[in-house]
Regions:
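RecB-family 4Fe-4S metal-dependent nuclease core
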Residues: 1-246
Length: 246
C-alpha cells in the first residue's frame, strides 16, 4: 500500500519540483527558522500534555532553550524584527497558558497510518486528541500562524484535520465533534464543527492530488521570491531557484 502524508500532498501545489526533490529523489533538505520555531513550541506543549513539564515550567524552558532550538535567523522584514516578534509571541503565550481544564487527553503527537483509498494510505500525527467535558472528541492542531487571512485559507488548512478524523472514526467508532486550531501566537482557538461533507471534500482533494502526482512527468518549479529565498528546503541547492534553469 502506497502511503502519503498531508504535508506531502500539499507541498505538491507549493512547488512540484521541490516535491520531486524531497519525495522522489529524496535529496536532503535544510531547515528554516519558521519550521524550527513551530517545532520548538510543539515540543514544549507535547512535554506538558505528556506530564513531562508543569505549567509553571513552560516559559522558563522556552527561554532557556530557544537559542539552541531555533538557531537560524528569521527573514528580514521592513516593518518588524520577525525573530523578536516570534520570540515575544511564544513567550507571552506560554506565560499565560492555563492548560485545558476539564478535557481528557486521549493522545499527544499521535502517529497513525490508515487506508484512505484502494491501495493508498494516509500517514500523520495528531498534535492533541481530546475528550471535552461533554464527552465529545476534539482534534487540536498547534499552529504558529497568527491568523487565517480568509475563509478559503482556513478551509484549506482544515482539510488536514478532517482527513485525520478518519483515524478517530476507525479507532473510536465515532467522528470528532470539532477540529480546533490553537493559533498560539495570537492566543486564540479557531474552532470548526466536523461535518461529513467537509470530510468528503478533503477526501476528494486528496484523491485528485494523488492522481495528479502519479500522472506527473514534468516536475516544474513554481518559483516565488519569499519561498525560494527563505522557506524551501532546497533554497541553497535548487537548480531552478526563482526560475533559473541553470
Amino acid at each position: 500500500m502506497k502511503t502519503y502524508s498531508f504535508s506531502g500532498l500539499n507541498s505538491f501545489y507549493t512547488c512540484p519540483y521541490a516535491y520531486y526533490l524531497h519525495y522522489i529523489e529524496k535529496r536532503e533538505e535544510i531547515d528554516n527558522a519558521f519550521n524550527l520555531y513551530g517545532s520548538f513550541v510543539h515540543e514544549i506543549l507535547e512535554k506538558y500534555f505528556k506530564g513531562e513539564l508543569e505549567l509553571f515550567e513552560l516559559a522558563d524552558y522556552y527561554e532557556e532553550h530557544f537559542d539552541e532550538k531555533v538557531p537560524l535567523d528569521f527573514p528580514p522584514n521592513a516593518f518588524v524584527d520577525l525573530g523578536q516578534t516570534y520570540y515575544d509571541n511564544g513567550l507571552a503565550y506560554l506565560e499565560s497558558f492555563e492548560g485545558l481544564d476539564g478535557y481528557e487527553v486521549l493522545g499527544v503527537e499521535l502517529e497513525f497510518t490508515i487506508p484512505i483509498f484502494d491501495g493508498y494510505a494516509l500517514h500523520g500525527f495528531i498534535d492533541l486528541l481530546l475528550k471535552d467535558p461533554r464527552g465529545d472528541i476534539v482534534i487540536m492542531d498547534h499552529k504558529s500562524k497568527k491568523k487565517f487571512t480568509s475563509k478559503e485559507e482556513k478551509e484549506k488548512y482544515a482539510r488536514q484535520l478532517f482527513l485525520y478524523a478518519l483515524y478517530v472514526h476507525e479507532h473510536y467508532g465515532r467522528w470528532p465533534k470539532r477540529i480546533v486550531f490553537n493559533t498560539f501566537r495570537s492566543q486564540k482557538y479557531v474552532k470548526i464543527q466536523f461535518t461529513e461533507e467537509a470530510l468528503q471534500e478533503a477526501l476528494n482533494w486528496a484523491k485528485e492530488t494523488i492522481e495528479a502526482i502519479e500522472s506527473t512527468t514534468e516536475w516544474n518549479a513554481c518559483p516565488s521570491e519569499f519561498f525560494c529565498d527563505h522557506i524551501c528546503g532546497y533554497r541553497e541547492s535548487c537548480e531552478r531557484k526563482r526560475g533559473s534553469d541553470n
